[in-house]
Amino acid sequence: MVLHQRLKSEWSYIILEVVGGTTPIDEIDDISLRHLITLALNQSFGIFGSAIPIDFLHRQSKFLYLRCHKEDKKKVLVALGSYVREPEQIRLMVLHASDFPCQAVPFS
């Protein structure tokens, strides 16, 4: 029996930093952050963009570790990099994006 390992991942991993805002970042819950990401995708790519599946892998204070499908990576990066939530002045800054989870190293 030959074991086969896939070296090409189907997923992309993204590290975001939540920046700015009048509300302290630690007080924003995960559902609100997910809503911000959906709004960013909707603003850039409409209703079809908001349907792009994104998984929250981990949250460490103001850093978010996300996973999306490799084919959607460019759309997700464009949408997140250009979105600013107006009343609160919250924006999502992309720090790192990779196709391998080992390259998405947590910040200390």
UniProtKB/Swiss-Prot annotation:
GO biological process per UniProt: endonucleolytic cleavage in ITS1 to separate SSU-rRNA from 5.8S rRNA and LSU-rRNA from tricistronic rRNA transcript (SSU-rRNA, 5.8S rRNA, LSU-rRNA); intronic box C/D snoRNA processing; nuclear-transcribed mRNA catabolic process, RNase MRP-dependent; tRNA processing
Protein transport listed as a keyword: no
The EC number(s) this enzyme carries: 3.1.26.5
Enzyme class: hydrolase
One cellular component term from this protein's GO annotations in UniProt: ribonuclease MRP complex
GO molecular function, one term: ribonuclease P activity
Superkingdom of this protein's organism: Eukaryota
Catalytic activity: Endonucleolytic cleavage of RNA, removing 5'-extranucleotides from tRNA precursor
Protein name: Probable ribonucleases P protein subunit pop8
Organism, scientific name: Schizosaccharomyces pombe (strain 972 / ATCC 24843)
